[in-house]
């Protein structure tokens, strides 16, 4: 996870059930931020080593200490990205197809093509500074009459285009 420590700023953490160990405290260079970690030659193997060290750490936070709205003077969870762009892959849930057609007012042809395409439609979503973290506020356009909640699969890629993880 990423979390905010008021005295030191953004940190990477390793979650063990209901506790969090500060990985940045274990290795300030390799765990400086997500971008630094992803750029390592083998981020997965590196994190295995950090996790072994973290398992022995007595210095733990309870996850509840981080689970509240962001505030500069208190510890809180941050979005799980730092410098990465966010991209989406098509309209992938068949169940959402009609909702998207209805919402787009005449976008039937576009959404039919997205659903029936040989590969998913890739589209740019946002930059990191626009991402709301856990317990953060989201912005909805004032002219929006409704919002469609959708489940999402997130895939984390390294700069070398290796799949590092997913949620």
Model-derived regions, located:
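Gly/serine-rich nucleotide phosphate-binding loop at the start of the catalytic core
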Residues: 1-43, 48
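Active-site microenvironments in enzyme catalytic cores
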Residues: 45-167
């Amino acid at each position: 996870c990423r979390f905010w420590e008021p005295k030191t700023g953004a940190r990477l953490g390793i979650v063990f059930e209901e506790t969090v160990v500060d990985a940045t405290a274990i290795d300030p260079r390799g765990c400086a931020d997500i971008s630094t970690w992803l750029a390592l030659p083998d981020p997965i193997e590196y994190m295995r080593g950090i996790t072994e060290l973290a398992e022995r750490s007595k210095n733990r936070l309870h996850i509840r200490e981080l689970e509240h709205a962001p505030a500069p003077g208190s510890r809180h969870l941050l979005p799980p990205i730092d410098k990465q762009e966010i991209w989406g892959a098509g309209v992938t849930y068949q169940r959402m197809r009609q909702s998207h057609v209805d919402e787009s007012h005449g976008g039937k042809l576009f959404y039919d093509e997205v659903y029936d395409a040989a590969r998913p439609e890739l589209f740019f979503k946002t930059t990191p500074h626009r991402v709301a973290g856990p317990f953060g506020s989201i912005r909805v356009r004032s002219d929006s009459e409704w919002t469609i909640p959708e489940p999402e699969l997130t895939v984390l890629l390294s700069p070398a285009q290796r799949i590092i993880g997913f949620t």
